[in-house]
Amino acid sequence: MEFIILSLLLLSLALYSLYYVIIKPKPTTQNLPPGRKGWPFIGETLEYHALSKKGCIEKFMSQRMQKYSSKIFKTSYLGADMVFLCSAEGNKLLFSNEHKLFKPWLPRIIENSFKSSPNITLQDEFNSLRRVIGSFTEPNALRRYVGMMDANAKRHLRKYWDGNDVVKVHDLSRKFIFALCSELMYNIHDTRTADELENLAHCIMTEFFIIPVNIPGTKFGRAVRAGREFHQRFRNMIKQRRLEIEEKREPEHKDILSLLLLEKNKDGEDLTESEIALKMQAVLIGAYDNPSIAISTIIKFLAELPEIYEQVLREQMEIANSKGPDELLSFDDLKRMKYTWNVISEVLRMEPPNSGTFREALTEVTIDGYTIPKGFKLHWAVNATHKDPECFPNPEKFDPSRYQGNDIVPFSYVPFGAGPHICPGKEFARLKLLVFFHNLVRKFRWEKIIPDEKMIRNPNLMPEKGLPVRLYPNN
């Protein structure tokens, strides 16, 4: 089956290439950014993902920046003409001109799977999700979540870490974050249900963002099927929640599902069950994927840098010693975790979970003297500025002190985006990470089983072997 699919794809590529050679594109007088498109349709997508799987995605950018002596270059990626922006100035232009010069973009087949309705634009979809997430993460709600997060972290460590000599970190970080988000966002307390949903989400995230060809038997096809099952599970939850509302049994706090049931479409009408289910899927995957990756990466760095671990432990012990034996963390406690957050920030600089997102030019735009035609796609590359010595001196050195002052070049540190459209879940993610590491470092020390294990992107960031570690309880 795979051979037949591959043969058909190669035949299509050959015919397209012949067409491309015979009917050459008309030359343009525009001063486009330097670069090449690579193979027709595929472009340089395969090379990008090959470097990702080797754990050196930044080479894709650095090689081209060096070759063209430019921090902006064009290529063809995910089937589209695309410009990579690799500078703080490029980031600033992109983040400061949403709706004016740029709009969100995803490959069509992925966009159609992401949008809750064919009649809604991607921009409207994002705006709707930002409203819901903004309500869910308003300051009073965040204060309420801290104790719940702390109780979840303690329960997770007792169940999956205590009594084990060796654990596989990445599996457990995914399990913890997904269960936590499921409970806070959708009032899911059943472990089995959360685990089943997490398996579906993992399939979607690991197999969706590849060459988007929806053919049975391919990885993308499996991701589409997982998405359909995910969708149906959420529709069942919506029916159950509506029944709870009728019977006045709904949760006390407004979770994501409650907020989505109040959301209206652009015509002022209630959202359909299918629209709500797709929004539920998008919010949950967004809240789960990057924080779970971040936990794995932070644990990796703390294993490699024992002196950093000791300082994190010292700060967390000071906070723990100021509280009663069974007293849960408060929002004010998290404000005191300044060094721990600096460490997490430096991990997110060196290994950002998200490699960047995409925009489309709404009009012709000039950047660094180059013309970006209307309709061209743009990619802001997180790794490019995070590893730029002009933005971060000695960029390969792990240095949490970078974040003690206000010396960071604006728009260079972008693991959550920047500007008016910074990730609305940033503070929610910060709380999850701080609460988890407050509990973890006080219970355990650890060492890597595979000393030279790399972080790779396949397509998302992950430890190549799942990051097995040996645990040493702190007595």
From Swiss-Prot:
Keywords: Heme, Iron, Membrane, Metal-binding, Monooxygenase, Oxidoreductase, Transmembrane, Transmembrane helix. Its cofactor is heme. Its EC number is 1.14.14.-. Heme binds at C423. Pathway: Secondary metabolite biosynthesis; terpenoid biosynthesis. Pfam families: p450. It catalyses: (21S)-21-acetoxyl-apo-melianone + reduced [NADPH--hemoprotein reductase] + O2 = luvungin A + oxidized [NADPH--hemoprotein reductase] + H2O + H(+). Expressed in flowers, maturing fruits and in juice vesicles. Its main location: membrane. It is found in: Membrane. Belongs to the cytochrome P450 family. PANTHER family: BETA-AMYRIN 28-OXIDASE (PTHR24286:SF381), CYTOCHROME P450 26 (PTHR24286). This is Luvungin A synthase CYP716AC1. It comes from Citrus sinensis.
